């Protein structure tokens, strides 16, 4: 039976540099599944989740797919509504991930970039959990430099994510991004080599 690719589960809180690390893995030739991009595609024009979201949350979609602001307002502070939304979106993302894995089944290694990997059962399907991390002051500065981001919005996002210290404790490997790109790239390159070797 053919051996499946070694799976690196890549995760990290907002502003930790996960997107940069994912680009580094791509640069090194590892296919990367981007769960956030899969969510956007499923909720975009013609996306497979749009009709179900409109049925569950009337008025939150339009010609461009889901209106993310309206949907956020519909579920914010309502755990039951959030669970309903997740029950629609998660299966769509899982199908896209399964297609990605089939498409790259002959590769020695792949990366699954999943922001909430450790908040759900996703970590069980990977061979190694890599958590991207940086000092809190660096994280805060990065996030607040984004257009439209406020300290209040940052706090709301962080409230839905495991604390960085907890993620670090659950990680097989921590990828530090607070010391510059070169040290980060060296860690990523080392991990890519290990993954290709199936370790």
Regions found by a protein language model. Name each.
Residues 16:
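ATP-binding Walker
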Residues 13, 25:
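P-loop (Walker A) phosphate-binding loop of NTP-binding proteins
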Residues 96-99, 124-125, 145, 149-199:
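Small-molecule kinase domains that catalyze NTP-dependent phosphoryl transfer to phosphate-bearing small molecules
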Residues 10:
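Hydrophobic anchor at the beta1->P-loop junction of P-loop NTPases
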Residues 97-104, 109-145:
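ATP-dependent NMP and nucleoside kinases share a basic, alpha-helical "lid"
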Residues 37-109:
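ATP-dependent small-molecule kinase phosphotransfer cores
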Residues 19:
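Walker A/P-loop
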């Amino acid at each position: 039976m053919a051996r499946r690719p070694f799976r690196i589960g890549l995760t990290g809180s907002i502003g930790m540099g996960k997107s940069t690390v994912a680009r580094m893995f791509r640069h090194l030739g590892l296919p990367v599944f981007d769960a956030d991009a899969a969510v956007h595609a499923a909720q975009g024009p013609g996306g497979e989740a749009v009709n179900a979201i409109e049925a569950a949350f009337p008025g939150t979609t339009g010609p461009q797919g889901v209106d993310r602001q309206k949907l956020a307002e519909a579920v914010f502070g309502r755990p039951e509504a959030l669970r309903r939304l997740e029950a629609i979106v998660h299966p769509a993302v899982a199908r896209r991930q399964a297609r990605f894995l089939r498409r790259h089944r002959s590769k020695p290694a792949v990366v699954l970039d999943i922001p909430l990997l450790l908040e759900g059962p996703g970590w069980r399907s990977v061979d190694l959990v890599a958590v991207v991390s940086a000092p809190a002051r660096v994280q805060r500065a990065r996030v607040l430099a984004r257009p439209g981001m406020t300290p209040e919005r940052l706090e709301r996002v962080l409230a839905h994510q495991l604390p960085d210290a907890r993620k670090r404790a659950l990680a097989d490997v921590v990828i530090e991004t607070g010391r510059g790109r070169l040290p980060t790239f060296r860690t990523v390159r080392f991990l890519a080599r290990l993954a290709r070797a199936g370790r």
